[in-house]
Structure formats: structure tokens, C-alpha cells
UniProtKB/Swiss-Prot annotation:
Database matches in Gene3D superfamilies: ephrin a2 ectodomain, Galactose-binding domain-like, Immunoglobulins, Phosphorylase Kinase, domain 1, Transcription Factor, Ets-1, Transferase(Phosphotransferase) domain 1, Tumor Necrosis Factor Receptor, subunit A, domain 2
Stretches assigned to the Eph LBD domain: 25-204
Family of the protein in this entry: Belongs to the protein kinase superfamily. Tyr protein kinase family. Ephrin receptor subfamily.
Cited PROSITE patterns: EGF_2 (PS01186), EPH_LBD (PS51550), FN3 (PS50853), PROTEIN_KINASE_ATP (PS00107), PROTEIN_KINASE_DOM (PS50011), PROTEIN_KINASE_TYR (PS00109), SAM_DOMAIN (PS50105)
Name of this chain's protein: Ephrin type-B receptor 4b
SUPFAM superfamilies: Fibronectin type III, Galactose-binding domain-like, Protein kinase-like (PK-like), SAM/Pointed domain
The keyword Repeat appears for this protein: yes
Species annotation: Danio rerio
List of catalytic residues: D738 (proton acceptor)
Gene: ephb4b
Length: 976
């Protein structure tokens, strides 16, 4: 009983929260449904007080009723029902509707009036009751309850009936009788309904439970798993659930049933077959999944997707993996004969079959006439004959002057189960000792931005004439990307090359004896470059010399006049914005130094026919007009996407000159991390500037859109690209002045390129990038600008380095706004007080230290861009250093870092003070654990000690050892 009560208590909350399935009632007797006399037994029968009558119920239906109003209250008056079969119920409910007269409303003769009656029951296996049996008394009858009225009738009052429901039981025999006994009550029995409650059939938790009669407080019912489900785990016990005595299911079921493979759960009570094109591989509550690529199902309720014809799964593939197919044949087999050694090379199949486990096998056939047999076992293959992962095999041990057929087969993981022969390509080779002499004298005849004309010296042949030549070329440094061209003459034209790029070229000759060796690689570049053809070298030298003399004279006169006119109002030569040309170095030329700015446009930007351009959509707006995406199709060249800046109508000459100045600037730069100028359109309206199209847009918005999606090494790669572009600009003596993440563009390969050179001279103010107006005029983006540029408009490459440090912070914070919501004046004040931005979350300590180096107050102390590129390269080569992050203060926001000068080393009284003084406090715990707990221990530390402690960065080792040397020199003044 205690266990049952515990189950009931435990299930109470579950019943309330999940809702109850209504109990089902089975009626054993209902007098309201009787249409004839009830023929109940009345006692005493000689002078019966109970009287059967016809009446109307509350709905106006005719019903049979009994009423009694005895004058003598000393006599008991009984009324007994007919035999009622119990139908297996262990207890029943009796619903009684009756009225009762109030005793005070009765005449005085009813002095012993009562306002209650008693209900009894008697059990029997047969209908044996009579007028005298059983005896009309409490025993053998069992008393159920004394029933009192809630509403009493009085003369002239409201007529209201009473409804009472009582429970009768326990019942054990086939049926029972109900008996009503009154003694002095004046009442009417309007209706009697006898029923019992049972738990209805229900499905829960993928288990089906039958209709259940409760025989006790709770009755355990056994169920079965619903259709298309089965028990999970090792248990085979059927599901169970408890049925309460009130006909309600109690608590959740105990069930391990779950949907079978090929079926998914629906509403937690049934399993539905997976549709065509879907599958489910295991028993459980997971949903059906779409079939992997190249597979399908043939019927609903599938547990596995079958591969489409021609596709297979390897024995090592998982059952739910995509189906793949064997690869297509290898392409372009190239061979080289050296005596009796053959080297085979080939290109990758066009179709890898959807797999990465591609390998190759080489078959050799020895042919004499029309008869071919397998090659001898003495032939060797390097690196192997079967399952070769690469695309090059060297075959040794061949016979001279013999014809061989070599077949290269492409295979992958499903080739063995495909029951088809691997795709292959074959080549016939005849060995000979009389091979062609190597080619020499390779030279460039003519070059353009996308093509090169090459010729070479015809090699002398002693026995066989040269049939043709084979040339191979690739970008310099990419030895695995060779492309091949054949030529019958000693020259060839290579097209579709990258501009301003260096290529390595090799040539070999073929005779009747086969191909000779490739020549040594020769480096040849496309335009623009600084080379001149030999035929024009002398003329070019003379013209250059004359031009330099004239230019030097003009520059001297211009500088003299300029300094004379500006000496009083501008004593600092850096403020003029002019850039002097270096010795033998290509430098930037300011287009505003031209008397006619249009001449600068013609010199540095290529004019493009407007018919070559197709504008597709507007992607933004700039200072001068709209920015669009379009296509550029120059005849003879591949169509490319371009970004198009347009000059809005109604412009002034100055606006047109300022708009095109950016093209004059951009056209001077050729670098993979500088936005590339395709050309300009000035001969028609609107005037346009065309640049390469960068799919991912501005870096700041791209990072915010992909917050947290990139690893530190990827972010460092982006920063390295930006630094490389700025290194190129600084070497060109160009100062950007507005370096920020919003002015860095990102292409589909995550390559970052510096852009927006017009803003280096014309900065506008807007709500997202507020600027500060200096006393000298002009707008400056405060948050990105070095303090000397804010105060004195002193823009140099060092001020660009400061801005680059802010860009680093933007990148590592995924586009966070520098200095958050601080005002411009607060930013200026904080920088003047030597406060700097803290490291972004999860920022490697080495990167934040590089930021702090870029934010040195003295511009001469900041690193150059070449040093920044080298530092980032070291981090990329040592990814482990990016796992060390700085300590970030707790709290809702990160305060600015105090970068004021540390105290002198002589004031350091502990190891912790010393490490903080040299900004190496990150190693404090490591020093303590290694036993360096006092200053006197530090003076004897070595490089080996630092490695043992965990200081692996060369820069940190150098900084610590340098400080240790200082401690040794000033050891006498240290306080221990």
C-alpha cells in the first residue's frame, strides 16, 4: 500500500502538467432510460409507503420516480433495486438525484420527521432476492452511507433537487442490489444511475495500452509497442503503466519502445514511415534524413539509401555516407625518354568521382608488331606500380629500340566494388639511345600584360631531325602547376597570362627517337615591368638620361620656389604632402603635381570602351555617386566581374578632377594586396572608375557578419596581407592617411586588399566615422589617426603604422568599434595620457603586443611595415604562439590599458615587479613554479632556463635576457 501511495504522489505533478485522458464510464443501470415500471421491491409490502410514479425530469423527459412521506417515523421503509451485474468492476459509483422536504415545513403531526436516508447494498452470484430474502436489516445488507440533502423543499420555496454520488465496494460477486431505507423522511427519488470507471485504451511513448479496469487504488497494465516500433536496449520487458481507481492513467509509462529503422516519431505516440528519398538507419527517436548524394530509396520506410546506378560505397564508407563513382581517365600523359628510362607524367582526371582517395596504377605491355605481352618482372617502377598517389612514375629496366604501351589507370575507394574496369589512358613509347639534344637560348621576344612571345635556339642533331617542340610553363614557385604547349617551330606565343607576373619556362625537342630532356628553367615576366628589348636599349638609355636631367632641373626649381613661398607658414616639410623620389626605386607620383590632372589619368589609367562594360546592380553609394557591380568583357580576354564607381551628374570640373585622382593614384600600384585598377571611362557619361570586384566587401562589416567564425591563424593571414600591401605603399613613399578596416576589401578567397585612396586626401564626415577638424583644416578620423597627425597634421608612414595597429584591433575583435562609445575628445585625452586599447577577447598576447608597438607615442619607436610583415610571418610559422592569450579584466567592459612608462628596474623589489616593469607579467606563475622567486635568482638566468620555464618566443627571450643584463650591471643598486 505504501508503494502505491508513493506512485500516486510521484505521478501527481505529471498528470497536472501533461493533461489527463478522460476516464471512461460504463453504466450498469440508469432509471432515466427506463420507459416502463421499474418493479423495484418495497418493504413493508402490506402497507407500502414508497410509491412509484411517472414524472418529468429537468429536461422535460418522462421518467419513473419513487416518493415516500410516512406519517409514522418509527417504521423503516425499504426500497430495493433489481439485480445489477457488476461486469467485472471491483467498485461502482451510484449517482442519486432526489428531493427532500424540510421538517419545519411539515405539519405538526410529523414530529419525528428526518431529513436523511440510508443507502445499502447486497452482493450475490445469482438473482435470488425476494420479498423476504435477504432480511430487511443492516446485516446482511452492507451500509454505504447516510445521505443528507443539501437543498430542502419548503412550501412556496424554490424546487431544487439534490445530486449525490457515492462509491460502493469492494465488489467480488457477479452482481449486487441497492437498497434505500428511510425512517421519517419525506422525499422523492428522481433518478438513480449506477456506473463504474475504467482507463480507456491509450497510446503513449510509442506504447499501446488496452482498456483497463482498476481493481485497486492503482492497477498495473501491460502494453505493447505501437506499430513500427520496438524495444531498445537489452530489456525485453513489455511497457507498463498504472491505471488509477478513478479511471485515469497515472504517471508516465515505463517503456523502452522507439521507432524502428525506416520510421520516425510523430507526436510521441506513433511511428511514420520515411518517405521516398529519406531514410533512418537505427532504432530511436531521430527523424528521417534526406538520402546522401547520389543515392535514393525504392520504397517508404527504408533504413538505408541505395546508390544510384553507377555509384557505390566503399567497404570502409559508413552506411549513411554519400555514394561515389570511379574517377574518369587520367589526362595528357607526358613522357620523357632517357636511354632506357621512361618518366611518365599526367594530369588529374576531369572527374574524381566525388572522392579524395585518388590513386593511379601503371600497366606495361611489350609490343612486337601486333603482338603485345606483359612486360618483364625486371622492370622497376618508382615510387611504385600500383596505388601511386602522385602523378609521376619513373620506369627503369626497359629494352632499347623497343616499343612499349604504358596504360595509366585512375582508381579510388569504390573502384574495387564498381565491377567495371578502371578508366585509363595509354601512350606508345619506343625506347632509343638517340634522343634529342637539350634546347638552349630561351628568350623573350615580345611581351604584353597577358601574353609573351618566346623563341629559342634550334639544337643541332646528328642523326634524327627535330619533329616538334614541347614547352611547359608555370608561375614561378608553383612547380606542381605546369601547363604544356606544342610547337613545330622554335618560337611560341603564350596567352591568357597574369599581368606583372613571373613565369618559369622549359623547352624540349622531340625527334623520331622520342623527347629529349627539358631545358633549365628560364624566368620570363609579363608587362608592366622595367625591361626593354635589346634593340631599343640604347635609345631608351639616352631618352631616360635626358628625361632625368630635365626632371631634376624642374624638381629643383619647383622645390626652391615652393619652399620660398611656404617657409613662413609651413616650416615642416612633412606637412606639404609631397613625396621625394628615391634612388633607383619606383615611387609614387602625386597626380596633383601635374599642371593638367587629366594627363596623370592618361598616364596611369587605361581608357576602356564603354561598350565593354555591363552594369548589373547598384551595391552602394560613394562620395561622388553610386557604386555598382558589373561585367567587363574586353575582346580576346576572359570576362570578369568589376566594381564600378560612377560620377553623378551635375559635377564641377574640380569634382571630376578629384574623382579621377583616385584612379591616377591606384593605377600606379601593382600588388596582390592593393586593389587593382582595371581602367577608367572618361569619353562618355557617366565618368566611371573600374576596379576588380571584391565579393565579400568591406572588412569591418564582413567580420561582424562572421563573428567568431575564423581561427586566429586565419585572422593573422588577413593581417599579413594588409601589412604586405602597406609595406608596398610605404616603399613607394605613399602615405594612405585613412587606413581602417572599412577601407580594406575582401575577396572570395579571404584575400584582403587596401583600397579607397581618394580618401587619403579627401576625407568626409558621416555618422559612422566621425572626424575631428584640426586647426589647420581638413577632416581626420580620430579613432584611427596617430596623435601627431591629429595635433600637427604630420602624416607619414609611421602614422599609417598607428592606423594599422587599430586595424589589427578591429580584426581580432571581429569588427568592434575602436574605443566603443567614447567621444572623440575622450579618445584624444586618453591617448595623450598614454592609455591604449586592451586586447580583444581571445586575442593572442603576441598580437596585442604588436598593436602596442604600433601605438608608441614616439613615431620613431614604431615598427616599419617590413618589420610587421616579418613578425606576422614568424607567428604564422609558429601557430603555437597564437594560443597564448593575455589576461582580460573582469567586468562589463574592458578599460583602456595604462601605457605610461614603467618604474626603473632599480625600484623592483620582487620578481613580479620586475616582470611587470618589462611587461612580461604573463610569465609570473611560470617563474615562480620554476623556483625563480627572488630578484637575486634572476641575474643568473640563461636561455635554457627560459625554454624550461616556457618562454619560447624569440622576442620575449631577447627582452627578458636584455633586462637581466641590465640587472647585472646595476646589481649593486637593487633592493633585495
Amino acid at each position: 500500500m505504501d508503494r502505491v501511495c508513493w506512485i500516486m504522489a510521484l505521478s501527481w505533478f505529471w498528470m497536472v502538467s501533461t493533461g489527463l485522458v478522460s476516464a471512461e464510464e460504463e453504466v450498469l443501470m440508469n432509471t432515466k432510460l427506463e420507459t416502463s415500471d421499474l418493479r423495484w421491491t418495497i418493504y413493508p409490502s402490506g402497507d407500502p409507503e414508497w410509491e412509484e410514479m411517472s414524472g418529468l425530469d429537468e429536461e422535460g423527459n418522462s421518467v419513473r420516480t419513487f416518493q415516500v412521506c410516512p406519517m409514522d417515523s418509527s417504521v423503516s421503509h425499504w426500497l430495493r433495486t433489481r439485480f445489477i451485474p457488476r461486469h467485472g468492476a471491483s467498485q461502482v459509483y451510484v449517482e442519486i438525484r432526489f428531493t427532500m422536504m424540510e421538517c419545519s415545513a411539515m405539519p405538526a403531526s410529523f414530529r419525528t420527521c428526518k431529513e436523511t436516508f440510508n443507502l445499502y447494498y447486497y452482493q450475490s452470484d445469482e438473482d435470488t432476492a425476494s420479498a423476504t430474502h435477504p432480511a430487511w436489516m443492516e446485516n446482511p445488507y452492507s451500509k454505504v452511507d447516510t445521505v443528507a440533502a443539501d437543498f430542502l423543499l419548503r412550501r412556496g420555496g424554490e424546487r431544487k433537487s439534490n445530486v449525490k454520488t457515492v462509491r460502493v465496494g469492494p465488489l467480488s460477486k457477479k452482481g449486487f442490489y441497492l437498497a434505500f431505507q428511510t425512517q421519517g423522511a419525506c422525499m422523492a427519488l428522481l433518478s438513480v444511475r449506477v456506473f463504474f470507471k475504467k482507463c480507456p485504451a491509450v497510446s503513449r511513448a510509442f506504447s499501446s495500452f488496452p482498456e483497463t479496469l482498476p481493481h485497486s487504488l492503482v492497477q498495473q497494465a501491460e502494453g505493447v509497442c505501437v506499430d513500427n516500433s520496438a524495444p531498445t536496449g537489452q530489456s525485453t520487458a513489455p511497457p507498463t503503466m498504472f491505471c488509477g481507481e478513478d479511471g485515469q492513467w497515472v504517471g508516465p509509462p515505463s517503456s523502452t519502445c522507439a521507432c524502428k529503422p525506416g520510421y520516425e516519431p510523430v507526436d510521441s505516440d506513433r511511428c511514420r514511415a520515411c518517405g521516398l528519398g529519406q531514410y533512418k538507419a537505427s532504432v530511436g527517436g531521430s527523424l528521417c534524413r534526406v538520402c546522401p548524394d547520389n543515392s535514393n530509396t525504392h520504397f517508404a520506410g527504408s533504413s538505408l539509401c541505395v546508390c544510384r546506378p553507377g555509384y557505390h560505397r566503399a567497404t570502409s564508407d559508413l552506411p549513411d555516407s554519400a555514394c561515389t563513382k570511379p574517377p574518369s581517365a587520367p589526362r595528357s600523359i607526358i613522357y620523357q625518354i632517357n636511354d632506357t628510362v621512361v618518366t611518365l607524367e599526367w594530369s588529374e582526371p576531369l572527374d574524381r568521382g566525388g572522392r579524395s582517395d585518388l590513386s593511379y596504377s601503371v600497366e606495361c605491355m611489350h609490343c612486337r608488331g601486333s603482338l603485345c605481352v606483359q612486360c618483364a618482372d625486371s622492370i622497376t617502377y618508382r615510387p611504385g606500380q600500383m596505388g601511386v598517389p602522385g602523378r609521376r612514375v619513373i620506369i627503369r629496366g626497359l629494352l632499347p629500340h623497343t616499343t612499349y604501351t604504358f596504360t595509366v589507370l585512375a582508381q579510388n575507394g569504390v573502384s574495387a566494388v564498381s565491377h567495371t574496369s578502371p578508366a585509363s589512358s595509354s601512350v606508345n613509347i619506343t625506347t632509343s639511345r638517340d634522343v634529342a639534344v637539350p634546347v638552349s637560348g630561351i628568350r623573350r621576344i615580345k611581351a604584353s600584360e597577358s601574353s609573351v612571345s618566346i623563341s629559342w635556339t634550334v639544337p643541332p642533331q646528328t642523326q634524327h631531325s627535330i619533329q616538334d617542340y614541347q614547352l611547359r610553363y608555370s608561375l614561378k614557385g608553383q612547380d606542381d602547376g605546369w601547363q604544356y604547349v606544342s610547337s613545330r617551330s622554335s618560337s611560341v606565343v603564350l596567352n591568357d597570362l597574369s599581368r606583372a607576373s613571373q613565369y618559369q619556362v622549359q623547352v624540349r625537342a622531340r625527334t623520331a627517337a622520342g623527347y629529349g630532356h627539358f631545358s633549365s628553367a628560364v624566368s620570363i615576366s609579363t608587362l608592366p615591368d622595367d625591361e626593354e628589348s635589346p634593340s631599343r636599349l640604347m635609345l631608351t638609355g639616352v631618352l631616360v638620361a635626358i628625361g632625368l636631367l630635365i626632371l631634376i632641373a624642374v624638381v629643383i626649381v619647383a622645390v626652391f620656389c615652393f619652399r620660398r613661398s611656404t617657409r613662413r607658414r609651413d616650416p615642416d616639410p612633412d606637412k606639404s604632402g609631397q613625396f621625394l623620389m628615391g634612388q633607383g626605386i619606383k615611387v609614387y607620383i602625386d597626380p596633383f603635381t601635374y599642371e593638367d590632372p587629366n594627363e596623370a589619368v592618361r598616364e596611369f589609367a587605361k581608357e576602356i570602351d564603354v561598350s565593354f562594360v555591363k552594369i548589373e546592380e547598384v551595391i552602394g553609394a560613394g562620395e561622388f555617386g553610386e557604386v555598382c557591380r558589373g561585367r567587363l568583357k574586353v575582346p580576346g580576354k576572359k570576362e570578369n566581374y568589376v566594381a564600378i564607381k560612377t560620377l553623378k551628374g551635375g559635377y564641377t570640373d574640380k569634382q571630376r578632377r578629384d574623382f579621377l585622382s583616385e584612379a591616377s593614384i591606384m593605377g600606379q600600384f601593382q600588388h596582390p594586396n592593393i586593389i587593382h585598377l582595371e581602367g577608367v571611362i572618361t569619353a562618355s557619361c557617366p565618368v566611371m572608375i573600374l576596379t576588380e570586384y571584391m565579393e565579400n566587401g568591406a572588412l569591418d562589416s564582413f567580420l561582424r557578419l562572421n563573428d567568431g567564425q575564423f581561427t586566429p591563424i586565419q585572422l593573422v593571414g588577413m593581417l599579413r596581407g594588409i601589412a604586405s600591401g602597406m609595406k608596398y605603399l610605404s616603399e613607394m613613399s605613399f602615405v594612405h592617411r585613412d587606413l581602417a578596416a572599412r577601407n580594406i576589401l575582401v575577396n572570395s578567397n579571404l584575400v584582403c586588399k587596401v583600397s579607397d585612396f581618394g580618401l587619403s586626401r579627401f576625407l568626409t564626415e558621416n555618422s559612422s566615422d566621425p572626424t575631428y577638424t584640426s586647426s589647420l583644416g581638413g577632416k581626420i578620423p580620430i579613432r584611427w589617426t596617430a596623435p601627431e597627425a591629429i595635433a600637427f597634421r604630420k602624416f607619414t608612414s609611421a602614422s599609417d603604422v598607428w592606423s594599422y595597429g587599430i586595424v589589427m584591433w578591429e580584426v581580432m575583435s571581429f569588427g568592434e568599434r575602436p574605443y566603443w562609445d567614447m567621444s572623440n575628445q575622450d579618445v584624444i585625452n586618453a591617448i595623450e595620457q598614454d592609455y591604449r586599447l586592451p586586447p580583444p577577447p581571445e586575442c593572442p598576447a603576441s598580437l596585442h603586443q604588436l598593436m602596442l608597438d604600433c601605438w608608441q607615442k614616439e613615431r620613431s619607436s614604431r615598427p616599419r611595415f617590413c618589420a610587421i610583415v616579418s613578425a606576422l610571418d614568424r607567428l604564422i610559422r609558429n601557430p603555437a604562439s597564437l594560443k597564448i592569450t593575455g589576461r582580460i579584466p573582469d567586468g562589463p567592459s574592458h578599460p583602456l590599458l595604462d601605457q605610461r612608462a614603467p618604474p626603473p628596474l632599480s625600484h623592483c623589489s620582487s620578481v613580479a615587479d620586475w616582470l611587470r616593469a618589462i611587461k612580461m607579467e604573463r610569465y609570473e606563475d611560470a617563474f615562480m613554479q620554476a623556483g625563480f622567486t627572488a630578484i637575486q635568482h634572476i641575474t643568473h638566468i640563461s636561455t635554457e632556463d627560459l625554454l624550461r620555464i616556457g618562454v619560447t618566443l624569440a622576442g620575449h627571450q631577447k627582452k627578458i635576457l636584455s633586462s637581466v643584463q641590465t640587472l647585472r650591471i646595476h646589481g649593486g643598486s637593487l633592493r633585495y
